[in-house]
Design a protein with these regions (language model features):
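Hydrophobic residues on conserved beta-strands that form the core of alpha/beta folds
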Residues: 2, 87, 158-160
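Acetyl-CoA-dependent GNAT
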Residues: 4-7, 18-28, 32-95, 103-108, ...
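Hydrophobic pocket/interface hotspot
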Residues: 13
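Conserved catalytic-core motifs of GNAT/GCN5-like acyltransferases
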Residues: 74, 122-126, 137, 142-159
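Conserved GNAT acetyl-CoA-binding A-motif
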Residues: 113-124
Length: 168
């Protein structure tokens, strides 16, 4: 089941975000940097995001426990059209990887973006994050290699690429 996030969900979202990021970025980011990821800082971020709907946040729930989340809204890219949405973040608890949670969250985000009038959607993914690249490609996204850029994550430079697909 996927539903809109409430303020009470911020801590669980932050925990999943932190644990999943530590698992995903292991080997891409130095371990000492990964240890500095803070549930408290992420909780404050997601609490504010939920309160102000920027981005919109949905959670996947199994047996009354949050097992994943997605944040989505209009694209933050400067030159994007107003009809382009963006997946800002999509994470499942590592215990729920490859169990359909991500696809359920993607479906909810797609529906939400479609309701907002979006016709395309993008996502920025680290080039070395094979799991995320496979997931997005399985969901119909295509890499736009000309968009590759360097982002700083926890003080470490990471190469990212934008992926894009039509909403329908």
């Amino acid at each position: 089941q996927v539903r809109p996030a409430t303020l009470r969900d911020a801590k669980a979202i932050a925990q999943i975000h932190t644990i999943a990021a530590q698992a995903v970025y292991k080997g891409l980011v130095p371990d000492d940097q990964l240890k500095t990821l803070s549930v408290e800082k992420r909780q404050a971020y997601w609490r504010e995001a939920i309160e102000y709907c920027e981005p919109q946040v949905q959670v996947a729930v199994e047996d009354e426990k949050i097992v994943g989340f997605v944040g989505f809204d209009r694209s933050r890219d400067e030159k994007s059209r107003p009809t382009t949405g963006e997946i800002w973040a999509i994470y499942a608890a590592p215990t729920h990887w490859s169990k359909g949670v991500g696809l359920a969250l993607w479906d909810a985000a797609r529906d939400g973006l479609q309701e907002e009038g979006c016709t395309n959607v993008t996502a920025w993914v680290p080039l070395r994050n094979e799991r995320a690249l496979r997931f997005h490609e399985m969901a119909g996204f295509k890499r736009e290699m000309s968009t590759a850029k360097t982002a700083v994550v926890g003080g470490v430079k990471i190469e990212e690429v934008r992926l894009k697909r039509p909403i329908n």
